Design a protein with these regions (language model features):
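Polytopic transmembrane helical bundles with strong interfacial aromatic enrichment
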Residues: 1-92, 99-248, 286-289
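Short, basic, low-complexity termini and linkers enriched in Ser/Thr/Gly/Pro
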Residues: 86-94, 100-102, 247-285
């Protein structure tokens, strides 16, 4: 089942990369699609090595970490090709006094830090899972009946790091949500994923506790891994949308080769599709300015 799903994902990624290369006017995004295809190929190679070498911890952890990166890359492509990203997100209502317009550097910093922290936490969790440290601390919420373990080993240290990481991630997500709610609550494209992050992290912490208390029940453990991926990609969505203005200012949103689009079949398609036509977006942006 795992190999069949992996093959299907690889096939769909090939289709996506080819589609981007043929139809997407933004050169950087076409190459991003190629990089995404490269990541899924590398993921398949790591999967093969994992089997050949009988699940070594280092390769298995790298396999898990690259899977998260590939997932994030596909989500990023979905964001980059969405009408909201291309045309610009509009507040749900008229901005109210005291609220900000475009996301500023503080939100960008907070969201980026949260995303990096979540990914680091996932890597620590994968290390814990593949080194057999999942039950190194068998109780919850205490650790051997104490707030801090009264004895140590490498497995206990990894498990303890994962629990501390959960606290840090929860704090980072709550900080991002509080900042978005206080400054950008009229921006639905930020408020919705920020609020979803809070709900997901509550579920994730609950699943983590249940994983320990159930002695690593396979279903509970699997949903814990799944929810972690959802927390990561939801944070990534907030991060990308917070950085959108800066990315657009650097010209990455618009293909630097659009002037050559008339030389191939993409040109006529873009002219008749205002959402997919970056030149039209430029004119609209200038008109709004």
């Amino acid at each position: 089942g795992h190999r069949l799903i992996a093959s299907t994902v690889g096939f769909l990624t090939i289709i996506m990369a080819v589609w981007l290369w043929r139809a997407e006017p933004r050169r950087w995004l076409r190459w991003f699609g190629v990089a995404t295809l490269g990541s899924v190929i590398a993921q398949g190679l790591l999967g093969g090595l994992t089997v050949l070498f009988f699940l070594p911890a280092v390769i298995s952890t790298a396999h898990a970490g690259l899977a998260e990166i590939f997932f994030c890359m596909t989500v990023a492509i979905a964001i980059f090709t969405s009408p909201g990203w291309i045309a610009g997100y509009a507040p749900g209502t008229e901005p109210r006094p005291g609220l900000s317009g475009e996301p500023g550097p503080t939100l960008r910093l907070l969201a980026t830090a949260a995303t990096v922290l979540i990914y680091t936490q996932i890597i620590v969790g994968a290390t814990m899972r593949h080194t057999g440290a999942g039950l190194a601390i068998p109780d919850f919420p205490l650790m051997f009946g104490h707030l801090i373990p009264d004895h140590w080993s490498s497995a206990i240290a990894i498990h303890f790091t994962h629990r501390v990481g959960a606290l840090l991630v929860s704090g980072a997500i709550l900080t991002v949500f509080a900042h978005v709610r206080s400054r950008y609550r009229d921006h639905r494209e930020l408020m919705r994923p920020a609020a979803l992050m809070v709900g997901l992290v509550v579920v994730q912490v609950t699943l983590g506790a249940m994983t320990v208390l159930s002695r690593r029940d396979p279903w509970t453990n699997s949903f814990h891994v799944l929810c972690g991926a959802l927390v990561l990609t939801t944070s990534l969505i907030v991060t990308l949308r917070a950085w959108r203005g800066s990315i657009a200012d650097r010209g990455l949103r618009i293909a630097d080769s659009i002037e050559d689009s008339g030389a191939d079949s993409r040109g006529s398609q873009l002219i008749h599709n205002p959402i997919r036509n970056p030149q039209s977006t430029i004119r609209n942006d200038r008109a709004r300015a």
